[in-house]
Amino acid sequence: MVESYETQNRIMCEVKSFNCPAYGKFCNDSHRLATLQLEAEVQNWRACFTAYVSAQKAYIEALDGWLSKFIAPEVELYSRGRSSVPRPIFSGPPLLVICRNWLAFLEKLPEKAVTYTMKSFEKDIRALWVQQGEEQHQKRKVDGLASELDRKVLAFQRAESRILESKLHEHESQANVRSRIEYLTEKKAMLDMFRKRLDMEKEKHHNSLQVTQHVTVNRFPTGFSSVFESLLGFSKASEKMYADLLAFGKNAKVLDEEASK
């Protein structure tokens, strides 16, 4: 597991230098769905990790409780000492010593660091999902305004054509033509204002897109790296724990054999 997490962490560090094919593209429903699925997987990952650690503790506690029933009171008292926290001491049957040491070591494993980084990463994923929703909302707003602008431009062009045609008819009064031209000028001013509004919304969408890209490209690799680093630390601590347990077990067995002679 140590080698696996080291490899995964190294890959996440290298990912920062790669060009993502989706970079710069607009967010769509499939992207948001993938984000939700990733959040669910990380939540399940954390739940499985917590269950894994809890299962180990529950198993050793049950085994310790069962073995304690066969230990004489004086040995039991000496094994526990004055502290309620199990200590790696060599007294009592070897199996009981291993259980006590195992429980003590399990409590010292950095499991909280792992769950903390996973929860932090889940928050980053949720923040991305929300940001993707805001980007999509802004994109729909821009698309709607763009369609409306096209309709307004088409209506303006038709009105402009009718006014130009009316100028060619001699029976059309100058006052009526002037009124239509003023109407057209007013509509053109409104059209220009609408274009400015659309440009402002496009700028908002561009900014929203940049925020989405920043979260995806920067916070995601960092979040994954933090998770793998914490798991790497947990795995190394676990590796050392089992090595120490093996050493304690051998020493306890030797002492037990010497005491029985």
Model-flagged regions — what are they?
Residues 1-261:
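Extended alpha-helical coiled-coil scaffold domains characteristic of the BAR superfamily
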